[in-house]
Amino acid sequence: MNKGQNQVVPPMSQFGGQNPPQLSSIPPIVNPVVVQNRTSPGTPFITNKAKEIYNRRQQEEISSDSEEEESPIEPAKSKYSRDSRDSRDTRDSRKPKKDSRNMLGSLQKTGTEIAYEPAVKFEMILPKVVKPTRPETPLGIYEQYTPILPPVNNNRFNPAAFQHLFAPSSALLYGQSVKMPMQNVYNINLPGPTGGHVAMDKIYENILPGKNVKCGFSTLGERIQMLDYIRQILVSSCDGENISIDSSGGNSLLSYIKLMELNPNFYSTITNNPYKGLPYGLLIYRSCFPIRFEPTNQSVVCAKNSIGLNIRLYALSYAEYYSYKLNNNIYLEYDVWRELMYYEYVKNRIIKSKQSPNFPILYAYFFCPNRNINFFQLKTNCLTRKELLSEEYKKFRQIHEAISNTGTNKIIRPMSMSGQNDKCQLPDEVDPLFRLYSGTTLILITEAPHHNLYQWASRTYETDGIVQRMTSSGFYDEKIWYDILFQIISALYVMQIHGIYIRNMTIEDNVYIKDLKISGKSCGYWKWIIDGIPYYVPNYGYLVMIDSNFKDTRSESSLLDRDCCEREYKIYANNIYSQKYDSNVLNENIFENYRRIINTNAFTKEHTKNNVMRPPESIMRLIELMSNDPEKNLGTVLHKYFRKYLNNRIGTLLRRDTEIPNVRDVTRQFNNGEMAVEVIGDQMYKWCMVSKTNSDGTVEIITRSDSNLDDYIIKDVRIETLKQYSPYENIDQNLDQEVKLDDNPLETYTISSN
């Protein structure tokens, strides 16, 4: 067994001895808990909640130790008082007498002499002279030589077998007479997707660039910098290179990363088996980069400040592989290439343009010729008896048996796509043999979140024998949940603007949380400008990520309105693929995804019995309001329910000495989201925000009746009742104990539907 892997240790019994007492026949009541094994040291997937609970436990141990050291009976006394000296002398008298002469001298001293002893005593100690020893000469001295015998049975070379060849008796007197050169070749065992373990003989220990910033990965600038660094390490010339995932190839991916859990973000109320949540033809591994070689146990571990990566392995069929390699346009008809194009589009059009940080970045993709991964066997092990008896599986079984009986010498070639047929059909629709695994795997390397939303909000425990030690409470206050909801809806609004629809999105499959490194309650804030209106969103250390898990979907409806090639896709988009869809139908389906995620039914007893913590009641009421709202424009939904993130000076009076002198008359048209001044009396002005300018000349503004409450009001006013503020002066927001709302946000994201 590999020493680098976690070994499952059976729990110990509470009773010892040869005859343990008999247990009661009544079965105990066991509450379901989410139990996980101990995390390996150096992993980048330790959550903020786990760190918080660990620090609390350490503080409890320190406080308990300090209470034991203090005496609960005697009051604290000064060490210079007579009582303290007497008690100290009494304690010292109980100690064993090391030197009777020193003790006698101390007894002869009077109390006055003891009181006036010098505080510093100077002594001169002569250094001990060490005589040089004469080196012993062995009976025979031989020249060093390189052994030519290779290690036998993959064991280490033993230089002791070549010692004392000329004078064997010298071994009894002088030990080794020749310093033998050590030439050990270590084979590092790494867990891999090919089954068993992978023997590696080369490990690259890289170092992440830049300084150890306080808020790592909190901005897209830091994430794009990491993207460039990883690509320079892994990619030689361009994407689509060949790379191996075992020791058979020259360039192995496992020389740079360490594979960890399989399908780590899988959540189900029925089973904890990660294979159940994998779609056919996909393996998802959690990994870390960079890695370090651990010489004590001959294994590979994550570096101290490593980052998390997702390694996605897609099984390419013959039709999928050859359609891409031959640069045929039909390759966009296959879901695997549509997902790759989706990641590329998100990286170039959303991430790099800084529209939203709530999507994972695709670092690189490779091809891996490898037939050792048995995707078919993985699918068979996950099917239920009902699925095994279905017609779909019977047909799938016939195809697999047909290719197995053809022999290894038969070469399957792609058929011609000349378009001469009356009905458009893809290669795997004409010949089912083209649906079989081609022996080539597509590898996508993306950013990795820590958990999905349900795992983030769940109580988790770490097993240590019979002890279940909590690692995450799963409880978060109203402010953090409000922040999470804003990020989810803003990301869905970006998908609505770009016309990106992922079929049947759910919380467990598509909403993930990445923990950020922060110090204190908050680490600055992000600034979203959505349709011209600025939102100041605090960074509480949690970043939402909307991702695709390539799950198998079955639907009777079709978005593709064509007479041929009636295929159901997992991702639809107007600006990514060659097909064009009805924008209204896409927006309608994106809104259905929003209604499926923002729903009170997402936190029913089905999930709470699985240790999922419900959001606070105020958040549940907000979710209910949003789910019942018929508004389909998600930008309007954000503007309606997240006004707490607007400038907190809205509805407050202008400061007489510093702000009123900067008030100006209206000389131009107001912009959406611009701070304006409302005249409420003689030399009395109140801050407001312009929402939009109406066609009749009135202006829609956002204000508050009470500056201490969140009762935001939208009303139409005449432009004569408004003033403009000097554009050369800053508007200082009110102080917040948790967030410093200055003029330096972490990053600014701009989302516009125009």
From Swiss-Prot:
CC annotations in GO: virion component
Chain intervals with Acidic residues compositional bias: 62-72
Compartments, record wording: Virion
Ranges where the record places region Disordered: 1-110
Organism phylogeny: Viruses, Varidnaviria, Bamfordvirae, Nucleocytoviricota, Megaviricetes
Chief localization: virion
Protein name, as recorded: Uncharacterized protein R403
Basic and acidic residues bias spans: 49-60, 76-93
Keywords: Virion
Biased composition (Low complexity): 26-35
Compositionally biased region (Polar residues): 15-25, 36-46
